[in-house]
Each structure stands twice: as structure tokens, then as C-alpha cells.
């Protein structure tokens, strides 16, 4: 298929189906907390290294089932999809979400973090940023990162533990793999080096 060829051109591996294994591996990503359904799984899985970083891309589907309030009407199913582009980093970090208004609203309500304001009015107008660690949010959303994100299409970003993820509310769009991988790789490069320095242990 075209997606197989796209993965091959990037030197990456493709697997059509991996069950729920990747969702379990990345269960800490909050997007999974709003998923419920009678059937779930990871499809169109692409893995490997891109610009020196381990990366994983996949579509996650789940099926919801509704019973009719009328005895004579059949039940119906709805197939829902998210797609993830994940870069695995060498250090763990606090949870941080950067997204357009409404995209992660259910997550925000569950987590309860307040919006973080930035000096850049354009950035604050475009994105809702939430984290329990405000200092880390400012370190990540430094001036170069803000300039870069303002120059990109609106993205939905979640960073937690070792995963830097782009999240989309539909299946992966063919032909966008390379550009999405370049985005997560660029964001990783714009993170200050000191964030990856070993933290001194408490006495």
C-alpha cells in the first residue's frame, strides 16, 4: 500500500495491526483516558529511527455501541479514530499539553490544570497550554519554540514522561508522515539542553 511505501522510503518499519500493545505502552498519554469502547486496537503502525530519535506512529481505533431507546430499533456502532506521532526521548518530563481550545478539553477537566499564560499574545491566542509544572512549561515553550509553533499549522501536542506526541482526531493522513516526523524532531531540538541534564539527588 501507499503507507507501506511511505514508511519504506523513510527507512521505517510498517505493521498493519498490533492490537492494544502500543496503547498499553503509552497508556500514560492522557488522550487514552477519554477513550472507551467495545473494541480497540492500533493499526497502521510505523516504527524506527528518524534523525537519530526512536519514533512510533499509529492510528488508534475504538468502537462505541449505543442501544436504541426503542425496542424495535437496532443498536448502532460508531467507529472513532485518533492518530499519534510519538518521539521517545532519553529523559522523563512532567505532563504538558499544548493544543487548540477544545481539543483536549475532556483531559483538562479530568486533570484540572489551569491555563498558563505567555508574553506572546499570538501564542496565547492560538494555544491552550496546561501543566502542573509551570517552570517546565516556560522552559519548553521558550522563545524559539514559540516562534516555531507559530510558524506551523495548529498542532495538538502532549508531552509526558519520555514521550513527545502529536495527536490528531482522525486517521493518519497519507503523505504527511515525513513532515510530522520533522516537527517532533524539531521540537525536540528546540528543548534546552539543561532539561536533559541529570538532576542532583536529594541528600
Briefly describe each language-model feature range.
Residues 3-203:
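Charged, low-complexity intrinsically disordered regions
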